[in-house]
Every structure is written in structure tokens, then in C-alpha cells.
Amino acid sequence: MTESGGSDMGMAGAGAAATAFDGSVLEANPAGMARLPGTTITVAAVPALVQLDFKGSATTPGSAHNHEGPKLTGSAFAVQSFSGLSLGLGLYSYTGLGADFGDEWVGRRVIEHEQLRSLNIAPAVAYQVTDHLQFGGTLRAQYVEVEASLAVNNSAALYGPPAGLPDGQVSLQGHSWSPGGDLGIAYQPRPDVELGLAWTSAVHHTVDFDVTAAGLHPVLGAILPQALPVSLSLTLPQQVAASGAWQATPATTLAATARWQEWSTLGEARQMSGLGDRPMFPQGLRDTWGASLGVRHRLPDGTRLSAGVAYDSDPSREGTMPAYFPSSSQLRLALGGEWPAREDLTVRLALSVIQQGEVRVAQLGHPLPLPGVGPLSGTFPASRFYFAALAVDFRR
């Protein structure tokens, strides 16, 4: 997620590692904190909506729609700068969102509802080495919460009588805390040019699940304890981002960012249970790259308007994804506006719309190897994600 509510959100992340417009620079490149004078506090509310549909194939016909409504995320950053030294604290999400396809769709035995939430608590420090060069870093405590629910086949053909039972339900919920960090460098070779390079570390999590079940066939109810305990081992990817910004005129800034993310490490995620150790991504994932271009313009009354476009490549290795991870290439369009409510307070609005490419599903099994899951094939046609932001910056 690049939508943390900072000024760079209205530029689709362009220039994020090079500029220092507000407190969210702590997340994008902690070195930029050294360019924020005095005290800076940034608080943002970021509602998100996912429009996602599934269309089955001839072998597994049917359709589904994501019934999950808008979700509210947010962030908060505080930076205090002294003589050559800046200290900060950030609270923000790294990745998240989820989907709810209901209990009637053809893939209900693969996934009905899923949710991934994350929170970073990140103390940070930055140092002004020279008038043109800054270094910075954070040490993050990252919290991840995972929820999933799926239907379970109660067919008498699998377990014997009684026959005619509806599907049962299995739900998993767990969380994990793990450390991570960020390093960054910012450099201004001349007054109208800003450059930045930032690294975000990978973070490994082992999520131990609480498993609950309801409505199971008596035989399956006796077998299920053999599957316990259930856990998920995953690594959220590291990232490297390089940004530049050019003050083309006294009122206009042009910016760009190039980034690389190591999604192949997430592709090694595995689910462990008493029934075995299985990959979440049998075909793995591949690393992705992305690029952003943006512009920011100041009007005579102090209002600032921004716009940006970004592209991120497809993480699938063989062109297909599991139904519980419908991710593909993404095109991001963004707009933003900032208004000086008073000398020490700025109000910001931003909108980011992500157009995601088609996702093909060709799933033969499930990481939780319960009987009767069956294959699932079809597509998630081009989908859209919407992020809005209402943020305030306080400076003193």
C-alpha cells in the first residue's frame, strides 16, 4: 500500500523517497525527516473499497462478487527536528485489505472470507550530515492479523451417512508481531533538485491460528483435531525505491519514483498443520517493479494541487493465482489537493484509483488439505480499488 495519506498519495507515490512535504516521509524515506523544521504532526484517515468479481469456467461455472464494504485505515506521524537531528514516530499500515465472497459461490470451499491487516509502530531517526545530505532509519514493530473462513464438504460420499448435510464451516484467526526496519538517504545536488533512495526490509511472520468449526459431519468432526495446530509462515517483501523531484518553476514540482519489491519471498509462504506442510503459492511468485510520475502545483492563494500515475507489474509466475490471492498488474491514477487552513495547519484530500488487470485462477487444491475441496478455475476480470484520504498536517 502506498496510500498512507501523505502528500505523495496525490502523486501516486511519485517522488516519495526524495521529497519531504509532511510527516509521512518517515515511512517513505526516514532521511527526509531531517528537512522538516520544528515539529510536524500528520494524521490521516484512509477509507478503502475493493470492487472484485469472479467468473467461473466451463468446468467450475458460477460467479461471485466481493460483498465487503468500505474499510477505514489510517496513519499518524510525528517528527521533531533539533539542530541536525530529527526524531520521529510513525503508526501506519504496510499491506492489507480483504474480500468476502459469501457462502454460495463455486469457490466457497477454497475461501469465503479473508482479511489481512497490518500495523507498523516505527520510531525513527534522521541526521543532517551536510547542507545537502541526510541519512535516516527506522526500527519497526510490525503487527499482522490474518482471518479466513471457508466451507467444508460434508458429503456422505466422503464420510458415509448421514447424507444430505449442508456444508460445514471452518474459520481461522491469528496474529503475529515481528521486527523490521528501513534505511534511507536523501541528497540535494542543487536547490531545485531532490534525490532519495530508501530500503524497506522484509519481515517474517509465523501466524498461529485459532481454528473454530461448526456444522461438520460427525466423522469430519472427529478427524479435524488431527489437523491441529495450524500456522502460516510468510515473509512480507522487502522494497527498494529511488525517487527524484525537480522544482521546474517556483510553483511547480515534477517527480518520479522507480521501485522493486521482492514478492518471490512471499511466494514461499507455507501453511503448516497436523495434516502436512503445504505451499500457499504452488507456482511461487515473482519480484515486481513499478514506476510513478507526478506533478504538484501551488496556486497563488497557497492551495496545492497534485496528480500522478503509477504502474506495478504482475507478481504471478505462471500467469495464474490462487483464489485467495487475486493479484495482478496495477495501474494507479491519483489526484490530491491541500489547503492552508491557517499558518500552522494544512488540510489535505486525496483520491487514488487502482485498475487491476485480469487474474486467472487454476487451483487444484488447498493449503488446508480437507477432503472434497475440488478444483477451481475461472477469472477475476479487471477490478478496481478505491482509496480516499482526509489528512491534516500540523507544523510548529
Give short role names for the model-derived ranges.
Residues 29, 54-56, 249:
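Intrinsic-disorder/low-complexity, polar/charged segments
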Residues 1-15, 34-52:
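Transmembrane beta-strand segments of Gram-negative outer membrane beta-barrel proteins
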Residues 15-21, 26-39, 78-84, 96:
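Outer-membrane beta-barrel pore proteins
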